[in-house]
């Protein structure tokens, strides 16, 4: 599609349709009521503005809930530029509502990969009063794309030849082409970006995995906070969020009756647990695939059959990948599936399913049914339905997680951004997790909304347990 672009002395944006702003604002108002943690943090810091004039780039699904996060960061002082972290996840009315307030946002549903990475660069590009192009001081990342781009750009300026190596995928080729272009158009740009960059907070399992890989290689340029492994993120967003949004995505995409169907959930981490619970709640017969014996045992103890993908071919109706790994469902698996099986992903990247290999098959007919629903017909007459082109089904085919559970995640993100900035001179170039007392505080902020009343320890009880009356109540090694 053709995005609407506007550049003025005060704001710039690339979105689908600015006329959707009023609709977006109405939904924002509803979401704020459902996001008590985020709104409480906004009220607490509205006067002190701990992020005053701090340049923040966000790369995170441009949804209504994210719009509430953006406005929270702005209300506590930040100078924000935003892009989505997925080509299909933007809610265009949410992007319009944010653009209408003067916040630069670069996102629309249905971007090409070239447009997506251009939008990421736009969100990264701040202009100083003297006209110099620079980057953010803090980053809110989801999947690690901004972190990857800055690191690869900086390495290129310091002698890396990675951009000249053959690309392993179409998307990698797009990234390399972008970096080559920036090298010509903005000499020394990435060095200026890194000089001012103070930290990143990462939302997802996939992005955190990238961060640890970079850190283990000794190449991490900044301190990073692993928001994903906060208990109030991973055990809520990943688990309870997926429990509601997976079925929502499947039903909006296919109008399918889940009861009685055989559904395969690939992976039984927190996302897999939520996905399996979602399908079982509707009456599906769920089979789990796993590599980890602990997760496999957990799934079995919950009553799920645990087996291999190969054992399900020809009998399963629905496949859902949740792993964060690549090549979980291969093109050979796709060709051997039951006729008209539904295939989707609720992990992060589309490489969990071999989508590129599917598209490259000879004599395969692709039929677009509606946006984000494609039917692939094989030469033998059998077909599969691929949802959201192998990207996130809950955001590509529906609206993602509900506001309340995202309030947990985004409260963590906001606290992480404040902590990174206030302690920017003490953090080392490592990956950190938010301290336990902040994790408990995020949970506490959401209790009143759902009518929860906490029991209070006596001083004697607290002394017996060796904790403070006000918490934290669990050691860091405790597994919830």
Curated annotation (Swiss-Prot):
Q: What class of enzyme is it?
A: hydrolase
Read off the Gene3D superfamilies from this record. Answer: Adenosylhomocysteinase-like, NAD(P)-binding Rossmann-like Domain
Q: Where does NAD(+) bind?
A: 204-206, 238, 267-272, 290, 325, 346-348, 394
For this protein, the record's InterPro entries field holds: Adenosylhomocyst_ase-like_sf, Adenosylhomocysteinase-like, Ado_hCys_hydrolase_NAD-bd, NAD(P)-bd_dom_sf, S-Ado-L-homoCys_hydrolase_CS
Which Gene Ontology cellular component annotation is one that this UniProt entry carries? cytosol
Q: What detail does the entry give on cofactor binding?
A: Binds 1 NAD(+) per subunit.
* Superkingdom as given in the UniProt entry: Bacteria
Alphabetically, the GO molecular function entries are:
adenosylhomocysteinase activity
Entry annotated with the keyword Protein biosynthesis: no
Localization in the cell: Cytoplasm
Question: Keyword Hydrolase, does the record have it?
Answer: yes
Give the record's GO biological process terms. Answer: L-homocysteine biosynthetic process; one-carbon metabolic process; S-adenosylmethionine cycle
Catalysed reaction equations from the record: S-adenosyl-L-homocysteine + H2O = L-homocysteine + adenosine
Q: What is this protein's record name?
A: Adenosylhomocysteinase
């Amino acid at each position: 599609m053709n995005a609407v672009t506007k550049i003025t002395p005060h704001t710039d944006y690339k979105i689908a349709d600015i006329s959707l702003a009023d609709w977006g604002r109405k939904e924002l108002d509803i979401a704020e009521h459902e996001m008590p943690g985020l709104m409480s943090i906004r009220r607490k810091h509205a006067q002190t503005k701990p992020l005053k004039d701090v340049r923040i780039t966000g790369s995170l699904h441009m949804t209504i809930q994210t719009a509430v996060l953006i406005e929270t960061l702005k209300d506590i002082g930040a100078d924000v530029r935003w892009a989505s972290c997925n080509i299909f996840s933007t809610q265009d009315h949410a992007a319009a509502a944010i653009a209408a307030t003067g916040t630069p946002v670069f996102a629309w549903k249905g971007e090409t990969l070239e447009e997506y990475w251009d939008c990421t660069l736009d969100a990264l590009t701040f202009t100083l009063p003297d006209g110099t192009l620079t980057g953010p001081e803090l980053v809110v990342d989801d999947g690690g794309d901004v972190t990857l781009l800055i690191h690869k750009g900086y390495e290129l300026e310091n002698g890396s030849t990675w951009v000249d190596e053959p690309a392993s995928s179409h998307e990698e080729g797009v990234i390399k082409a972008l970096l080559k272009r920036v090298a010509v158009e903005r000499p020394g740009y990435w060095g200026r970006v890194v000089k001012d960059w103070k930290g990143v907070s990462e939302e997802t399992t996939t992005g955190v995995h990238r961060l640890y890989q970079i850190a283990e290689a000794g190449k991490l340029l900044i301190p990073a906070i692993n928001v994903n492994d906060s208990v109030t993120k991973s055990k809520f967003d990943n688990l309870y969020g997926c429990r509601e949004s997976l079925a929502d995505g499947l039903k909006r995409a296919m109008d399918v009756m889940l009861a009685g169907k055989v559904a395969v959930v690939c992976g039984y981490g927190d996302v897999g647990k939520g996905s399996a619970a979602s399908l079982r709640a509707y009456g599906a017969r769920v089979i789990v695939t796993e590599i980890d014996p602990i997760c496999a045992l957990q799934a079995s103890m919950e009553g799920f059959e645990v087996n291999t993908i190969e054992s399900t071919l020809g009998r399963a109706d629905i496949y859902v990948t949740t792993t964060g790994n690549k090549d979980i469902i291969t093109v050979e698996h796709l060709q051997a599936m039951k006729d008209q099986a539904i295939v989707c992903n609720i992990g992060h990247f589309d490489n969990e399913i071999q989508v590129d290999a599917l598209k490259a098959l000879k004599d395969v007919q692709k039929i677009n049914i509606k946006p984000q629903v494609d039917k692939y017909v094989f030469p033998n007459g059998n077909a599969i339905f691929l949802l959201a082109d192998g990207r996130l089904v809950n955001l590509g085919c529906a609206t993602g997680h509900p506001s309340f559970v995202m309030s947990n995640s985004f409260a963590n993100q906001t606290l992480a951004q404040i902590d990174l900035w206030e302690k920017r001179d003490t953090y080392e170039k490592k990956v950190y997790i938010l301290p336990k007392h902040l994790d408990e505080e995020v949970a506490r902020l959401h209790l009143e909304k759902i009518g929860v009343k906490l029991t209070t320890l006596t001083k004697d009880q607290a002394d017996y347990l060796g904790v403070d009356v006000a918490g934290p109540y669990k050691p860091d090694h405790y597994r919830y």
